[in-house]
A protein has these predicted regions:
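Signature for phosphate-centric chemistry
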Residues: 1-124, 128-185
Length: 185
């Protein structure tokens, strides 16, 4: 993964937005010793991830206080860009993310076609995490999800990974009109 084009783009953008030394120097008496043991960006990212996850727990531990407002915004933009590089139609991921969703979409449509052909009524449920749902929306060109940009600084304007919930409901409703024609809503 670290040799892939998308990861290089992600790393370059991360380096342009985040200085791990600022955080590490605030947190540790001897930041150099810590950096000798841990990759600086990875360690700071783990603290940021803990702060993100902590807000979902029933304990009120204010981990966001470890970061400046600028660092919180920077990490939000960087991780949003990472998600974009992994899941969008950006050329750097060679279609891996949305290619997986193409399989999911094909499965949904094939199962639906079979039910329609056999005259069945019912529901087919397919489960996918937020990444799968995002890629599905990319394939469908829903809202801005299918768009690409030419600069990492523009991603934030069209792509916000926090708008994809961990649990989603995407529905394809097929029905026949009075003439028996199948219509997709």
């Amino acid at each position: 993964t670290h040799d892939s084009p998308w990861y290089r783009l992600y790393s370059e953008y991360r380096a342009s937005r985040i200085n791990p030394d600022d955080f590490l120097n605030r947190m540790f008496i001897n930041a150099e010793a810590v950096k000798a043991e841990y990759e600086p960006y990875d360690l700071v990212w783990r603290f940021w991830l803990m702060a993100c996850v902590q807000q979902c727990l029933d304990r009120n531990v204010p981990m966001w206080d470890l970061f400046t407002e600028e660092e919180i915004l920077a990490w939000t933009e960087v991780e949003n860009y990472c998600f974009y590089l992994q899941k969008s139609k950006d050329e750097s991921n060679f279609g891996r993310g949305w290619g997986l969703a193409a399989y999911t979409l094909r499965h949904i449509l094939e199962e639906s076609a079979k039910d329609i052909r056999l005259g069945r009524h019912g529901v087919n449920l397919n489960f996918g995490h937020d990444g799968t749902v995002t890629c599905l929306l990319v394939n469908l060109d829903a809202d801005n999800w299918g768009k690409t940009v030419d600069s990492p600084d523009k991603v934030y304007d069209i792509w916000q990974n926090w708008n994809i919930p961990m649990g989603s409901n995407v529905q394809f409703i097929f029905y026949r009109n009075d003439d028996g024609e199948i219509i997709l809503k």
